Amino acid sequence: MERVVGAPFHSLSRAVDMLCLNLGAEVERHFELPKPEGRDRRVPSWSIHLQTPWRFVHSGRTVLASGDMYAPFAPDQVGEGWEYDLVGRPAVESSRFDVLSTGLSRRMAGCTVTACRASPLGDLE
């Protein structure tokens, strides 16, 4: 994990219920899919994938947590059949994570990783 120290924050995203913490300068990568000839894309150097409980805390207050992926942003606006794993919906039909992570990503723009270690409990700090 020492390799990410000094890396600029790029963005937050998710793949179903997995947090993607995207760090580092953009690099060009070739992807074989979705077309047979593939395509080139600019992507962050690293994407750390977390499928465990996590949270972002600022001034002692949790501003985004793993449970936000499973909670509707506007619970009174969605029906009983609401599903957390659908993306691309209007904000009132999206998860708390999908709505709040974009603002957190904007606020973290320009930040860099100053330290990274695993605690005795396995937390990334």
Across the structure, where does each feature detected by a protein language model lie?
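Surface-exposed, interaction-prone regions used to assemble/regulate multi-protein complexes
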Residues: M1-E125
